[in-house]
Amino acid sequence: MATESPATRRVQVAEHPRLLKLKEMFNSKFGSIPKFYVRAPGRVNIIGEHIDYCGYSVLPMAVEQDVLIAVEPVKTYTLQLANTNPLYPDLSTSANNIQIDKTKPLWHNYFLCGLKGIQEHFGVSNLTGMNCLVDGNIPPSSGLSSSSALVCCAGLVTLTVLGRNLSKVELAEICAKSERYIGTEGGGMDQSISFLAEEGTAKLIEFSPLRATDVKLPSGAVFVIANSCVEMNKAATSHFNIRVMECRLAAKLLAKYKSLQWDKVLRLEEVQAKLGISLEEMLLVTEDALHPEPYNPEEICRCLGISLEELRTQILSPNTQDVLIFKLYQRAKHVYSEAARVLQFKKICEEAPENMVQLLGELMNQSHMSCRDMYECSCPELDQLVDICRKFGAQGSRLTGAGWGGCTVSIVPADKLPSFLANVHKAYYHRSDGSLAPEKQSLFATKPGGGALVLLEA
């Protein structure tokens, strides 16, 4: 599956209200009809938060919400980009001179990332122009990867316009790399699941090499997504990139402590691999090697035997140069314990004991506690929402996505779903002060959706 290209499917546009509406809007915008459509889904990460960029496996599933783009290649060399949502302004630019401004996370920059990634992969300097109309129903800045879905969708659009072929794995790797044009140092989970997802199954996504394994979720439970309605724009915040750097520094200090060649080490997983020990043993090494008090740059330099100048020029990224404290112990503890929870989650799904929903729920609860206390990527609203979800019948509930806002994911016994939805809606969304005006997408049950594909009108 992963070595195949994304599927191309013929559809009767008239039978799909959303496609039909997009086709009509495209016609009124550009005065022509689309040649093809591309869709790429968002995702919910069930467990395994902030560990993909440390080299560890994660366990997401695609959601049914997606980014859908109507496309018409044109003879000019101009990219005309529009969005069905009037909040997002149009863009007209040369298809062969793509400029991405890292300082402004504008919506169209995510499209340009995907386009530029494919363009550079093939070394294309004369890309034909295209008219594109984008429609997305993934709530933005909610931790469901609306931005990565747009990058992936744009990558597949560009590939299709070029008439070239790439496997799903290659596409995922190119799109993950290209998102860095906008300054997001993610680990590749979002792009991988967007391409590798299959209907009806979650996936264990492993890295180096990238591969996906089916994980059958319990039939007696439903996964429910609840949006805290606190928006977190990942590329606009330094939180995320500081955590990436804290993990990198923790890996280097652990490697140095164990007399490994620390200067070559970038990820916490590499330390474990080089030592050849279990995740549980890595947690013990972390206890011995690192202290819970925050590290300042001077102490890190002393531990590694380098100068401040070397730390700044050789290790720190441009956006972490001015950080004064780094919590290395807490971040490493989270990563190693969360990586172990992912493997336990998969094992429970495979063995399917009678109390599996309860066991999976406990792992999700532990994950949230670690995200909140050790990784510090929660926020008061997420913690409140998690408590409400547990109170009204979720066996487990946790933040999902980068955190600092966005969504929670809860595992709910199927027979409790109607009362769960009603009670959570009342407790969280019906504020007496009327401060939350949620869209209908704020609370919904979801099942594993399929991956990115090309749609042709039959």
Curated annotation (Swiss-Prot):
ATP binds at residues 143, 145-146, 233-234. The keyword Kinase applies. This is N-acetylgalactosamine kinase. It comes from Pongo abelii. Belongs to the GHMP kinase family. GalK subfamily. It is an enzyme of class 2 (transferase). The record marks 43 as: Transition state stabilizer. One of its GO terms (biological process) is galactose metabolic process.
